[in-house]
Structures are given as structure tokens and as C-alpha cells.
Amino acid sequence: KGYENESKLRQDFKGEPIYKDYNDMKAAHAQIKKGLSQANPIGDIAAATKIMKLLDPGSVVRESELAIAMSAAGRLDRLQNFADMYITGKKLTPTQRKEFSALSDELFAAAGDQYNKKRSEYEGFAKRYDLSGDVLGAPHEGNSPPAMPTQDAVAAEIERRRKK
């Protein structure tokens, strides 16, 4: 009976929407990192497309939306991007790659936190009925999403940028 109960617990957990969402996010995060590490046009397009899919999972990424994502940068970066595209055929600047990578990390961390909350809930069920929580799989390990900056920190950053 213990095996059947643990199997049912695992099945119920895997049926939770957050389980699928987390595993989709995990795969997308790995694909984004791999695409950005290529530092070439195909990798850039793959990473940018995957970022757009993460932001709106059920959507089809249109060329115009992809262009918006890839041009998201300040004027200096856009100028650098244009020059790089002209000379090397690359699509994203190093700064844009870092920003895409950081966004991917933050989205993955947030998904991991939600996954771990739901997993903890099921671990509680397992303990209550004297079952092994190991059947749920490993928890997400990684950084938590960054905390929102304080109002003072935001004001200090604005002041620092004004002085430049």
C-alpha cells in the first residue's frame, strides 16, 4: 500500500500546473544560456525567441516582437549593435546578452521558488501520511529572485547616473 500511495502522491504532484511550468522553464533556461554562449546570430535569435516565449508561453513569437526584444537597449548599445551587425553579422551586443542572461536567471529563480513552495506542500502530505517525500524529485536549487530594491537604493542609483 505504501508504494501505491507514494506513486499516487508523485502522480498528483506531477499533475500540478507548476510542475510542468517549472520543467518548461528549466529547459528554456538551459536553451537560452546555450544560445547566448554561442555569441553568433543563430544563437542570439534562438535565445531572444526563447525569452519571448518565456514571457508569453502560449504565444507565437512574431518577427516584429523578436525585433523589439533584440533592439531593447539604450542608444549607445543600439549604435554598437548596428555596427556589430554590419561588420560581423551578430545580432546582440555583449551588454544585451548579459541582460538577456540575467533576465533568464531571474525568471528561472522565480519559477524555482514557486515550484519549491508547491513541492513543500506535497512534502507535508508525505510526512502526514508517513510516505517518502523523495518520490517528488529534487527541489529547485539555485538563487532566489533578487529582492526589489529599496526606495533609498533606487534614489541613490538615479543620483549616481545623473552624475555621469
Where are the predicted features?
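A sequence/structure-level signal for intrinsically flexible, low-complexity segments enriched in small
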Residues: K1-M148
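Terminal short linear interaction segments
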Residues: E141-K164
